[in-house]
Amino acid sequence: MAVRCSKIQRTDGRPGHSLQPAKVSFVAGQPLGYYSSWPLFALSHHMVVWYAAEHVYPSSFFFQSKLPPSEVFAYPGMEVFNEYTLYHAWVDEALSGVSKMELYAKA
């Protein structure tokens, strides 16, 4: 995340600093952790995981709290992880306009 500070002035009254409020501008959108970004990210992420779980295990609730890193071992959450990475690849492809196969061919 790139952060560019347009104007920062301290408010603690130390010598050489103004008592004006600090102003910071972010170059690339609102960073996670500020105001509503983090809850919105967490909610949307879990909705995608639950959507993937519904496709793997229809009519059942997915109780895995963590998904494994890729290619570690097989357990019930691994199928959900594979489905989730497939959705992630589709979104990346839709946003970039470049096919994943084209990207893999270049690598």
From Swiss-Prot:
Give the PANTHER family listed for this entry: MITOVIRUS RNA-DEPENDENT RNA POLYMERASE
Write down any Gene Ontology CC term.
Answer: mitochondrion
Name the keywords, alphabetized. Answer: Mitochondrion
Q: Which taxonomic lineage does the organism of this UniProt entry have? A: Eukaryota, Viridiplantae, Streptophyta, Embryophyta, Tracheophyta
Cell location: Mitochondrion
Q: What else is known?
A: A stretch of 270 kb of the mitochondrial genome is duplicated within the centromere of chromosome 2 resulting in the duplication of the gene. The expression of the duplicated gene is not demonstrated.
Superkingdom of origin: Eukaryota
The identity of this protein, by name, is Uncharacterized mitochondrial protein AtMg00490
The principal location of this protein is mitochondrion
